[in-house]
Amino acid sequence: MSQAAPEIIENPDGTKSIITYKTENGEKYKIIQKVRDVKITERVHRSVAERRSWAKFGAEKNSPPGPNNSTTQFGETVELLLDRNWRKIIEARTQKLKASASKTITCRLCGNAHYTMNCPFKTILSEISALEDPAAAAAGPGLPEEVPAGKADSGITATGAYVPPSRRAGARDPSSDAYRDARERDDSCTLKILQLNENADENTLRNELLFPFEPIQKVVVVRNKETGRSRGLAFVTFINEDMAEKALHFLDGRGFMNLILRVDWSKPKVPAPQ
């Protein structure tokens, strides 16, 4: 019995649904696979590309380009680190992978799966709290009489419901000047680095490019969500604005890993009033 050709459906989100059928033990099963085509451009040296186009000979004379699984054994890809501290670099990468594997992103304000700085509910949390409990909002800081101190500190009300820290009595408004000033201080010390080599990760930037400006608070390389490859963009947060400005003048236009860097502030600076 011939097997029917698979049915392919194009989805609006750019994916494809492949529908096939199979029969096992007298029962027919429908199999739906959802796939996404990802195009990855690999940059190699010119001589490597030329060797790949060489004509094959011997037993592989008429074989198509590329390795043949039946006659070629693939080895393990070995990364060469030309650095005296390569052991420390490998240990740091291992620790970072372990930390990222056990760490989940949770907003401190609403508890959803996104960063606190990107929370879409910053400006309305206080208004919702006031509408739900006008008496507590009017009373200001302090604990309600019906809530024991131990439960109030842990965010548990008398009814057993959990209250986020931003909605507890005495909590600061996320849209207040204090929160906004803290965010602006972070932006004032942050630079964006453009035209980065795709092979440059956070450890490479810290150890080979940014070491004259230590201590570095944070280094983030922007990556493609689908492939995990670098987009050639990174954000670096320094200890203060003066150190960030020194790094800006030193790194902008400098060559790094065969590319010319472009460095600027993460947000445009507002000129001081005359």
Curated annotation (Swiss-Prot):
One of its GO terms (molecular function) is RNA binding. SUPFAM superfamilies: RNA-binding domain, RBD. PROSITE patterns: RRM (PS50102). One of its GO terms (biological process) is translational termination. GO terms for cellular component: eukaryotic 43S preinitiation complex; eukaryotic 48S preinitiation complex; eukaryotic translation initiation factor 3 complex, eIF3e; eukaryotic translation initiation factor 3 complex, eIF3m; multi-eIF complex. Residues 189-268 form the RRM domain. InterPro entries: eIF3_g (IPR017334), eIF3g_N (IPR024675), eIF3G_RRM (IPR034240), Nucleotide-bd_a/b_plait_sf (IPR012677), RBD_domain_sf (IPR035979), RRM_dom (IPR000504). CDD domains: eIF3G, RRM_eIF3G_like. Residues 138-184 are annotated as: Disordered. The modification Phosphoserine is found at S63, S129, S166. The keyword Cytoplasm applies. Residues 138-150 have a biased composition (Low complexity). Residues 170-184 have a biased composition (Basic and acidic residues). Component of the eukaryotic translation initiation factor 3 (eIF-3) complex. Belongs to the eIF-3 subunit G family. HAMAP family: eIF3g. This is Eukaryotic translation initiation factor 3 subunit G. It comes from Candida glabrata (strain ATCC 2001 / BCRC 20586 / JCM 3761 / NBRC 0622 / NRRL Y-65 / CBS 138) (Yeast).
